[in-house]
Amino acid sequence: MTDRKEHKMKPGRRPTEGMTPSQERIMQVIRNAIDRDGLPPTVKEIAEALGMKTPSAHEQVQKLVKKGFIRRTPRKARSIEIVEQSPEEEPVEKKPDVARLVPVPIIGEVAAGIPILAVENHIGELLMDSRTARGPCFALKVKGDSMIDAEIFEGDYVVVRHQALAENGDIVVAILDGEATVKRLYISEETIELRPENRSYQPIVVPPGGDIRILGKVLAVRGHGAANNNE
């Protein structure tokens, strides 16, 4: 697991030094939204404002985080913050608290798209903060793009707490007719819906008595490349 660095401004560095033109435009959209609405934009709103695809906007936002221009709180809506740049300070190394890291097994793949056959196969592990990975947890690698508006992209890993029950609006991993999928859960008196976070996909409606089982609730999302693989 690589250490993360928080980059702060070096002496004489201009506010946009180190940004690409695309990243400068994204920063301007963020500033405008905060000035206008008092809230930062979502990645989807950034993409719409600049005529970009959501995955492309997400990639550039992540690069701005790595460069230290913004920070984000994982799995929190509208969590983008602009980092105030200090011209006196050098880059500061941030190391994880190793004592708090726990291994979470990666046991296979889950569909963010058409459900795929649920086959458990231990393919590696993620190191997670024990404050996040509470209880019996596992991870699955995401296939498909049905959850991109929730910032879950193909190749990412979802960290899931094993539980049979979940609340309306939770993002869950469900087994439907023997196949696994990650979707947002909505329950009514008549039906259960597994809703995608991508307008290109339709909700999966499960009638009363349908063959569905909640495998767990998604606690966190880790980008591809975060795993220690057995392969």
Curated annotation (Swiss-Prot):
Domain of life (superkingdom): Bacteria
Keywords of the record: Autocatalytic cleavage, DNA damage, DNA repair, DNA replication, DNA-binding, Hydrolase, Repressor, SOS response, Transcription, Transcription regulation
Site positions per UniProt: Cleavage: A112, G113
DNA-binding region listed in the record: 43-62
Region annotated Disordered, chain positions: 1-24
Signal peptide feature range: none
UniProt-listed GO biological process terms: DNA repair; DNA replication; negative regulation of DNA-templated transcription; proteolysis; SOS response
Top-level class of the enzyme under EC nomenclature: hydrolase
The protein's Enzyme Commission number: 3.4.21.88
Keyword Signal: no
Pfam family, one: Peptidase_S24
Molecular function, one GO term: serine-type endopeptidase activity
DNA damage found in the keyword field: yes
Catalytic residues of the enzyme: S146 (for autocatalytic cleavage activity), K183 (for autocatalytic cleavage activity)
Reactions it catalyzes: Hydrolysis of Ala-|-Gly bond in repressor LexA
GO cellular component entries: protein-DNA complex
Subunit architecture: Homodimer.
Family affiliation: Belongs to the peptidase S24 family.
UniProt-listed NCBIfam families: lexA
Known function: Represses a number of genes involved in the response to DNA damage (SOS response), including recA and lexA. In the presence of single-stranded DNA, RecA interacts with LexA causing an autocatalytic cleavage which disrupts the DNA-binding part of LexA, leading to derepression of the SOS regulon and eventually DNA repair.
Name of the protein: LexA repressor
Taxonomic source organism: Magnetococcus marinus (strain ATCC BAA-1437 / JCM 17883 / MC-1)
